[in-house]
Structures are given as structure tokens and as C-alpha cells.
């Protein structure tokens, strides 16, 4: 027989924060958003792995690839590379993040010499970048034969079918540097020759990287970036409950710092088996999150099974239709509040703190602050990050407005993988996600900075300088 709750569940949109006393020290510049990512024991000096900002990007094809992971790690958060791809491809993305050299950009705008001005304009419209590498085969690491920038053509005076080879700046007229050039040396060359960009090539003239003048300031040390002990960017990776025996070792070998089981419903034997395998093979050296759950029982099940963090939320995502298709889920605010209470009780009883992640239901920036105040240690976002330049999808023009493609892991586009499978027939018989578009919003850095400035300001209004204080303030007045 079904259990009936006495009260309906609630979403973030049904709540507002009541302001509290703000001391003279309570200003945004003094607010710390550092938060634990994985579990730790009482008395431990510090959490084994923490975030500098409480934001992580969702385990989705349309959100988290290596480019997103690098951009978010620079800001202090972490991306979980999507697992709905081959093991080899996911491991390669992880490896690219771990081997990334800050300041050295792999070109994402490349054409061959036989392409036309029309192709250049379409590529610029798609990527938003005005510097296009011309390589023999049109690939990012092909033999460099020239470069096209906006100074190389005038649309009003040229035919769209003009070959790139006729108006590009040829290689012999370019200032280039060796692929082993240091960032400082590259920046010195840029300033000495008044360049906007400097291509780095190997001994065979194959393009390796670009260094851009506009990125100079961002190459300076960013005190908020999330680095491992070897000064490499921290990156996560999604896994499923089917091929984990092969996928997990490959991702660990590639350098993944933390894993997360990607499933719409985590209160299951399949997740326990996955956690059991990882603990038996690696002990506590491999950090892995699990989920999703929406209540106390689900949290305790995963915490006792060995999860390093637990994701909270079912059906709350903007492109998730699990609630419509199955009639399961829970209002995100209610789910977070209940699971946070269970986490605190578990910590009091065992001395083990298992962080929770609110996944889904964030529509406005202030919902982030609410999620933190209600007890979430960090927040997983899909639609939010899908809007940015760094997401892996195409930017398209729809009725005069720029949009980014966005689809759910339960959609037909991603349905051949295991996120929504409970076992048995591998073919998914119905969708739990949809294809959509989200308004293009520009760069990740600018938007994350704006969103977090709102979070810090609101925390000051509530008299809190740290997330845990924010939660305590809310609980004391609830």
C-alpha cells in the first residue's frame, strides 16, 4: 500500500530567505564558498577533495566535455565528463583535461585552403571566434598553411565563394613559435610584435596551440582555480551501472579525480553493486558519488554502501520528463531539506560527513542560494552551463536569437545508454528527457562570476560568511 505524505512537497520557487543581522565584517569579499566534495571523518584536518565554489556541471552530453571541465576548474568548480559515450572517448576527454596547459589553446576553428569565405563566416557564426587556422587537412593539428582573421577579408567587397587560399595570411608571412615555447616566452613574442595571436607549431609545421593576447590577464595565477597536488586541473567523470568493471579502471588510469554514478534513480541494488566493486578493487582511494535520491532512506542506503557524496533530485531538471512519464519524483526543496537532515543525523551518529549535491530545479540564480541554505553542499547544473560558449553543443540562430542546443540524457538523442535502464532489455522503450534549446549567454567566466556575486551578497544579507553558517541561520529561524 502506498504511503501518503501529510504535506505536499515544495520547489525552490515557493521559498524566500528572511534576512538576518549583518555585521561590519559581513561583506561579499569576505564570503567563502569553499565546500566539501567528498566524505570525511570528524577530526580530519580537511576534506580530501573540496570545491572552491559550490557549482558542478551535469553529467550530460550537451553540457560536460573537456572544454567545459577546463573552464569550470579555472573558476573553482568541477565538471563530470559525460559517460554516455565509449569508454575510450570518455577517458580521452579526462586525459585532455589533466594534460591541459593553461594559456595554450587548441584551435576549434579550422578549415582547409579549398574552403570559401562562406565557410569562414559560417564557422565564425558557430564558434564566435574570428581567428581561423588554415591547415592542409582542415584539422586542429594539421600542417599549418595560413591563418584567416577578420582583417583578411571584407564581406561587402568579396564573393562568398572566394577560396580561402586567395585571402588568407600565408604561413611564410606569419610570426610563429616552436611548440615547446613557454607561456612567458609566447606572451613576450606577442607583445614584442604587437600580435593578437601566436600559433605554436612543431618541427613538421603541424599546428599544436594558439596563445592569444586577449587571454594574457587570465594566464596569471588564479587563486580560485581547482588543482590537484600536481598543479593539474581537477576533473570528474560519470559512470553507469553496467560497464563499470571496464570503465572505472580506464577513467582512473586517465587521471579522473572523482567519479559519479549517473542514474535517474539511485536507491537500487545496481548502485550498491557498483560501489561494492569500486571499494573491493580500490578501497577508499577512488572517490565516487552516487544517486539520485529524494528522501532519508535513499540517502542512508547510499551512504552505508560507501558513496563519497549523494546527489539529490528526481524529475526536477528543465528537460527531464520523468515525473510526466512515470509519476515519480519530489519537489526539489523538500527533497534537499529532508536529505540534509538525514546527512546531519548520519554524521552525528557515525562521525562521517557525506556531502549532498542538489541536482535539478534551479531556475533562477537565487535558487542556488536557497539550495545551499537548505543544506546542499554543492549544486549540479545542466541548463545553466549549457548556455555558455564552453558547452559542447552548437550555437544556432532561431528567429534572430542565438540559442544553444540542449538535450536530456533520457531523450531519444542519448537514449542508447544506461542512465534510465533498470536492467533487462537494453533498448529504452520510452523517453524521460527531451530535446530543446536554451538562450545563448556568453562565456562561463562572466556568468559564473555574476551568479556567485548574487550568492555572496545574499549570504551577507542573511549574516553568513560561509555556507554552513548560511544553513544554520536558516534552520534557527525555521
Question: Where are the regions that the model predicts?
Answer:
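Bateman/CBS regulatory modules and CBS-like beta-alpha motifs in cytosolic regions of diverse proteins
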Residues: 27-51, 58-60, 89-129, 134-137, ...
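Glycine-rich phosphate-binding active-site loops on the catalytic face of alpha/beta enzymes
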Residues: 74-89, 203, 256-268, 308-326, ...
